[in-house]
Every structure is written in C-alpha cells, then in structure tokens.
C-alpha cells in the first residue's frame, strides 16, 4: 500500500514486481547517464567560442552516434522482453480466479470451487472502522494463499475497467466480451490494495481492490467457512 508523500514504487510483494523495480532502476541509471552527457555537450557548446571553418563532415562521428544509441536500446530491450515474457507466462497455476468489473464494483468467482463467488464493494467513509484506509477498504476481500501460483481471468460486464494491484506488479484491462489473464505469485502474507485504473464513469474512483494473502491452511479454512455459510 502506498504511504503519504511516497515518491517511489510500492514495496514488492511478488517476484514479478521485484523484476519490475529492478528494470525501473536499471533504465533510470541509463537515462541519467544520457542526460548528463547531453547537458555536458550543450554546456560545452555554449561556453566554448572555438569554431572550425573547415569541418564539413565527420563519418566517424556519424557512425558513433548511430551505433552507440542502437547498443543502448539493445541493453534496454533485452530485460524488457524478458519481463514481457514473465508477465504472459502461465505455468500450471494452482488456483484460478475470475474477476469481473461492474459499474462500480468487482465480483469474484473461484473457478476451482463450486458456488464460491461474491461481490466486493467499497466501504463508504461513514462506515469505516479505526485503521481502515479511506476509499480503499471493501466489504469482501479477495482471499488468496501466499507462496502459490495464481491465475486471474479478467473481464467486464459493461464498460472498460482495469484490475490493478501495484505491489504485485499487476495491471490487466477488463474488456466486455473478452477474457484477459494475468498470473502472479504472492511472496508473503498481508493486505494488498489496488484500484480500477481505467476511467469507467462517475464512480470510477470508488471501486477498490483488496487482496488478503494468507497461508494455505488458513485459506482452506476460509473456503470451508465460506461454503458452509
């Protein structure tokens, strides 16, 4: 969950988010070095009064400023392609969830369990208890086991939505009439907050996502209690 005045990314709670943060830092270093080099060249050009009236062409210089940017782009593209593969790879998930976007709430279906489905609405500010985050808490949390491969099928019943949980590195569009899938692996137990990230109408800001990650035995107990209610 993001903190007040936080400037950086949220703490990673999945291997995918760890890789995304690493790629962000790696790319930022390259961009910083390029920015310093460009500003140094501009400053030298402004400050220096030396000119060369006989300098008409420079094949070597043109080769250098063509090859070096190409090499830099390759060094950025390779880890980026690796990340794209990891995002799309689904390897034998233990649990499959279907997340359906509505105006303006989410509903969840556990495909591996019969009759395990519910709607998840934001709790109004007046009904919050002490310690609950405003505009982020819901009446029914999505309970998932930690240390388990999970697949989520995302769709919508009306307009475009987007199912997003930043600390897990997840953002998947919910498109009417189409099933998109995303996979993740939660590294630790805890509460992970997200929101719809696609403008979907008047109450777009009021359809949060809350994932409660628990150990596997607690998850089995939760499923048993839910089905017995």
Swiss-Prot record:
Reaction(s) catalysed by this chain's protein: 4 Fe(II)-[cytochrome c] + O2 + 8 H(+)(in) = 4 Fe(III)-[cytochrome c] + 2 H2O + 4 H(+)(out)
Family annotation (Pfam families): COX2, COX2_TM
Key words, A-Z: Copper, Electron transport, Magnesium, Membrane, Metal-binding, Mitochondrion, Mitochondrion inner membrane, Respiratory chain, Translocase, Transmembrane, Transmembrane helix, Transport
Mitochondrial matrix side: 49-62
Enzyme category, top tier: translocase
Gene3D superfamilies recorded: 1.10.287.90, Cupredoxins - blue copper proteins (2.60.40.420)
GO process annotations (BP): ATP synthesis coupled electron transport
CC annotations in GO: mitochondrial inner membrane
Signal peptide: none
Mode of membrane association: Multi-pass membrane protein
Binding positions (Mg(2+)): 198
Cofactor(s) essential for the protein: Cu cation
SUPFAM superfamilies: Cupredoxins, Cytochrome c oxidase subunit II-like, transmembrane region
Entry's transmembrane regions: 27-48, 63-82
InterPro entries: CcO_II, CcO_II-like_C, CcO_II_C, Copper_CuA, Cupredoxin, Cyt_c_oxidase_su2, Cyt_c_oxidase_su2_TM_dom, Cyt_c_oxidase_su2_TM_sf
Positions on the Mitochondrial intermembrane side per record topology: 1-26, 83-229
Localization per Swiss-Prot or TrEMBL: Mitochondrion inner membrane
EC number: 7.1.1.9
Binding sites annotated in the UniProt record for Cu cation A1: 161, 196, 200, 207
Residues reported to bind Cu cation A2: 196, 198, 200, 204
Coarse class of the protein's main subcellular location: mitochondrion
Oligomeric and partner information: Component of the cytochrome c oxidase (complex IV, CIV), a multisubunit enzyme composed of a catalytic core of 3 subunits and several supernumerary subunits. The complex exists as a monomer or a dimer and forms supercomplexes (SCs) in the inner mitochondrial membrane with ubiquinol-cytochrome c oxidoreductase (cytochrome b-c1 complex, complex III, CIII).
Family: Belongs to the cytochrome c oxidase subunit 2 family.
Function noted in UniProt: Component of the cytochrome c oxidase, the last enzyme in the mitochondrial electron transport chain which drives oxidative phosphorylation. The respiratory chain contains 3 multisubunit complexes succinate dehydrogenase (complex II, CII), ubiquinol-cytochrome c oxidoreductase (cytochrome b-c1 complex, complex III, CIII) and cytochrome c oxidase (complex IV, CIV), that cooperate to transfer electrons derived from NADH and succinate to molecular oxygen, creating an electrochemical gradient over the inner membrane that drives transmembrane transport and the ATP synthase.
The protein's name in its UniProt record: Cytochrome c oxidase subunit 2
Species this protein is from: Pisaster ochraceus
